[in-house]
């Protein structure tokens, strides 16, 4: 039910605020909801973990993760206040007390308070992997994870990421 309420609110808001080009319910379920939940791995994600969803946009994957596992503490991070206003309305409607929002740009040093504060950083369709790593790794605690939901053509981005991985003292553990 919560996933449908989220979908309906997104489609209604999409009439005046461009949140997604995909509006057909079946396509939204497959391309947004299921894709977002594909990063949920119970071997990595444990009860009560903190997640920052960098460049959350319409809330993917953060909102589906927060609905699926209400023990997670999810911070939805985006640079566009209008999108965050939409997400606040979803959070209120669904009573997602495990969600908060953060306004700003990931690359800004003004978010020093949030550095190394999260168990996991997620991001979907935001930037090429080398840039994405620079924007997400600093927010993750030592021993934490960055989950980058990338498309089918990711190999080149992985190769381009070696310098960023070295500078950030990070490694790629798994690719699925």
Q: Positions of the model-derived regions?
A:
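S-adenosylmethionine
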Residues: 72-75, 79-176
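Conserved SAM-binding loop of SAM-dependent methyltransferases across substrates and taxa
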Residues: 58-71
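Conserved beta-strand elements of the Class I
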Residues: 52-54, 120
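Class I SAM-dependent transferase core
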Residues: 2-52, 85-102
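Residue-level signal for inorganic ion chemistry
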Residues: 10, 65, 150
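Short, glycine/charge-rich beta-strand/loop segments that flank catalytic centers
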Residues: 55-57, 81
């Amino acid at each position: 039910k919560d996933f449908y309420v989220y979908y309906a609110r997104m489609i209604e808001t999409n009439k005046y605020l461009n949140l997604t080009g995909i509006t057909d319910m079946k396509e939204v379920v497959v391309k947004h909801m299921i894709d977002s939940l594909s990063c949920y791995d119970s071997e990595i994600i444990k009860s009560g973990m903190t997640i920052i969803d960098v460049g959350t946009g319409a809330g993917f994957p953060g909102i589906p993760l927060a609905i699926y596992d209400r023990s997670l503490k999810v911070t939805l991070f985006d640079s566009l206040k209008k999108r965050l206003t939409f997400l606040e309305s979803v959070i209120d409607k669904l009573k997602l007390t495990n969600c908060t929002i953060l306004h700003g740009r990931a690359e800004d040093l003004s978010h020093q308070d949030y550095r190394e504060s999260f168990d996991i950083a997620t991001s979907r369709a935001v930037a090429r992997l080398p840039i994405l790593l620079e924007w997400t790794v600093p927010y993750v605690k030592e021993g934490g994870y960055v989950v980058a939901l990338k498309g089918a053509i990711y190999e080149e981005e992985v190769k381009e990421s070696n310098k960023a991985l070295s500078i950030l003292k990070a490694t790629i553990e798994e690719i699925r």
